[in-house]
Amino acid sequence: MDMSERIIVTYQVAAAPAEIAARAEALAIEQSVECPLAAVTEQQIRDEIVGRVEAIAPIGETRFSVRVSLASATAPAEPGQLLNMLFGNSSIQPDVTLADVELPPAYPAAFGGPKLGISGLRAKLGAPRRALTGSALKPQGLAPEALAGLAHRLALGGVDLIKDDHGIADQAFSPFAARVPAVARAMREACAVRGAAMLYAPHVSGSLDDMRRQLDIVRREGLSVVMLMPMIVGLANFHLIAKEAEGLIVLAHPSLAGAQRIAPDLLLGKLFRLLGADATIFPHYGGRFAYTPETCRALADAARRDWHDLKPCLPVPAGGIAIDRIKELLAFYGTDVMLLIGGSLLAAGEQLTEHAARFTAEVASHGQ
């Protein structure tokens, strides 16, 4: 890695026009040497390490886009230190949002990005072109066999990928070591009935040792997908597990991602992809979360667009969407997408398989 290269970071800053130049300089210092320039006596540090304000542009009466360049030498290709340099102390300042980052080519090469990406997931499902479907096992409190029964019925309806709800972990009522084999068995039975591939994504969580033990169970059961919550397990642990999950699709869940003032398209679309997410879940607008259409489009674009040599990451809109929005969703995202419908399917009760079949049929018919 060329340590003379610089990382370009874009922030959005709330400030009065007369104050923005000074505020931008303070931001550049905070995210680099973090001390008064009078304390920086070595000229090389002043020339190379101190952050530089590269551009300031208004985006509102009292809001500005500020581009700062940081020395790549301060941020080795390690998730924690990279994010620390991008937004560490400044994340505590309420007037600043981390909007985007432009990395030198050595960073994507070092982090690696998705191992399988969209094409890898499509290959596992035998679905080369159409949009994909997903659902979730819930609620918390169900025993392993009850969750397995839900998975079986969803799979009989043809749902491509069935994941644990993010609230289901390694709890007493549904221990990972009991739940995963039960659901995997139910999925195998449903796949045999339908003569098609459908996938189960267990939620891998806990300490690094816990997650490694859980990965062993996933492999033993012959599963192809895991789900992790990067902001809960830690970005460094997420990246490490994504690398160790050789041959597995890695699905990233956005839990806790709203606690930071980081633009969703950057965090869920770009950074999760950089660290190894093959697919990224996020709330679609109009559901029970407050994302806008512009945010959702930017996020999906960040996940899928050409970016260095990284494989694209599949957008997975979710969050309170229902079958009656399928046409709208596919018109918005196109076919390189997985629509994740959970609660509104499960509410069908005894008609769960029939509703799942309607969901998958409507998605499959799009564009025909």
Swiss-Prot record:
InterPro entries according to UniProt: RuBisCO, RuBisCO_lsu_C, RuBisCO_lsu_C_sf, RuBisCO_lsu_N_sf
A Gene Ontology molecular function term of the record: ribulose-bisphosphate carboxylase activity
Pfam families recorded: RuBisCO_large
Biological process terms in GO annotation: carbon fixation
Function per UniProt: Unknown. Probably does not have RuBisCO activity.
Similarity section: Belongs to the RuBisCO large chain family. Type IV subfamily.
Name used for this protein in its record: Ribulose bisphosphate carboxylase-like protein 1
